[in-house]
Amino acid sequence: SDLANANAVKELVIAGLLISSRKVISGIEWAKTLQGQEGVAKLVEKGKSAFVGPEIKGKRLGVIGLGAIGILVANAAHSLGMEVYGYDPYLSVDAAWGLSRSIIHATSLDQIYANCDYITVHVPLTPDTKGMFNAAAFAAMPDGVRILNFSRADLVNIPDMKEALASGKVAAYVVDFPTEDILGVENVIAIPHLGASTPESEDNCAVMAADELIAFLEDGNIVNSVNFPTVEVPRTTERRICVLHKNVPNMLSQISGVVSATVNGKHELKALV
């Protein structure tokens, strides 16, 4: 669940923002080539100008998708001095409570594309989102935009991304899902799917799985299921009956009648979920 690894991913996204700007990785690789040479300190001072990069403070970040991870990223980036735009047409009321008031509410993807120097995406892969970062999207962005993808590789049209990188439209692409067709491309920072790779995240996942099993076995609540919507109903009686059925007219009333006849008046039927 995103709730278990949200902080781990958030931290790596913030790292991605920094390394997409400051050319730290390429600078480190260059420094390794100086091994065995004389006057390394002087060589470093002479060569470091090739790795100049902008600060993120004061820049504009667009966060697409304001779920558990997106909200943490937006708030953290704002704390670092960025002007943050958030876009999510499906933002829940509960999620909105956790979003800083300072986050600018974008009403469309075009608003994100037109205004932001950095864009990070946190949405599921669906037929609508597959390839959403394509030539048309890049054309709407400012030159030198930096894009971070910690969601799914297929959100990005790779041939279009390569062209955008080659032209300078996209200054850097940070992706947590390396694929053969993107490896080795200049200005691509491919991270080996490390978003949730922390001991804390693994512990959180284990605890959450246990808690969710207990919630189902003891109260019938369903949370974070991959193939069923969330069902959370406060317990008001000692026992409850939950009926999962297709939306057939009068189905619940028929079942209620059968249950009422079965209990034969020995127990009060207060609720049928």
Q: What residues fall within each predicted segment?
A:
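Short beta-strand "acidic-cap" motif of Rossmann-like dinucleotide-binding folds
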Residues: V84-G86
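Short beta->alpha connector loops at strand-helix junctions that form conserved
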Residues: S1-A4, S151, H193-G195
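Oxidoreductase and adenylate-handling cofactor-binding alpha/beta cores
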Residues: K10-E29, N75-M82, V207-N221, S256, ...
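N-terminal Rossmann-fold NAD(P) dinucleotide-binding loop
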Residues: G70-I71
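Rossmann-like adenosine-cofactor binding region
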Residues: P89-I182, S197
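Phosphate-binding beta-alpha-beta segment of Rossmann-like dinucleotide-binding domains, i.e.
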Residues: D2-R60, N224
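NAD(P)-dependent dehydrogenase/reductase Rossmann-like domain
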Residues: D181-E186, L194-V273
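Glycine-rich Rossmann-fold phosphate-binding loop(s) that bind the pyrophosphate
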Residues: K59, I64-G67
